[in-house]
Regions:
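Hydrophobic residues within well-ordered alpha-helices
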Residues: 1, 46, 89-95, 130
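Short beta-strand->loop
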Residues: 18-23, 27-28, 111-124
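Short beta-strand-centered segments that line the small-molecule binding cleft or hinge
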Residues: 1-27, 31, 39-40, 92
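Short helix-loop capping/hinge motifs at secondary-structure junctions, enriched
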Residues: 14, 34-42, 135-140
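A late-sequence structural motif
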Residues: 117-156
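Hydrophobic hinge/microswitch elements
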Residues: 65-117
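Beta->alpha turn/N-cap motifs
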Residues: 7-12, 32-33, 83, 100-104
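Secondary-structure junction motif
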Residues: 37-38, 49-71, 138-142, 146, ...
Length: 156
């Protein structure tokens, strides 16, 4: 069965999609507790660590990299991985830092596997959305999927 629905972050308008906002999601800079000597708030600083994230079109990657450019902050390199779970495991293994939605790392932050690093006075946010193609029938399975997604974001 093919679902033609998905969860994503708002980056513009698309009249071909029926969208439901799931709410604002805060972003957090995370590292392992062993990471040392990094500062992403001091302008002009070089951090000898890797930035671990997914593809270049990722909205939270774009926000992080734009902020670093504004602050003239650099990192050793960027490691691109396909899944958030892989990113979290590499960060926990002290390979580098990442900038992710808080809900994606909440469990690891609570357990102490990851720590939040200072990144600014206010946390930046993104709008999570669920969408499906406009004008297409919504199957019972897709309707259930959309309900589950909405309930998990409301509860979260």
């Amino acid at each position: 069965m093919l679902f033609r629905s998905g969860v994503f972050y708002r980056v513009g308008n698309d009249d071909a999609l029926n969208r439901r906002e799931l709410g604002e999601q805060s972003l957090v800079l995370v590292a392992s507790p062993q990471i040392a000597d990094v500062d992403f708030t001091e302008p002009g600083r070089h951090n000898a660590c890797s930035f671990i994230i997914n593809e270049p079109q990722c909205v939270f990657r774009q926000i992080f990299e734009s902020t670093l450019r504004q602050r003239r902050i650099t990192v050793e390199n960027t490691i691109e991985l396909l899944s958030i779970e892989s990113i979290k495991r590499c960060v926990a293994a002290n390979i580098g830092v990442s900038y992710l939605p808080r809900f994606a790392v909440e469990k690891e932050l609570e357990s102490g596997e990851l720590i939040e690093l200072p990144f600014g006075e206010q946390s930046q946010t993104i709008t999570a959305m669920c969408a499906h193609h406009a004008g297409k029938a919504v199957s019972p399975a897709m309707h259930t999927f959309i309900q589950c997604v909405e309930e998990s974001f409301v509860a979260g």
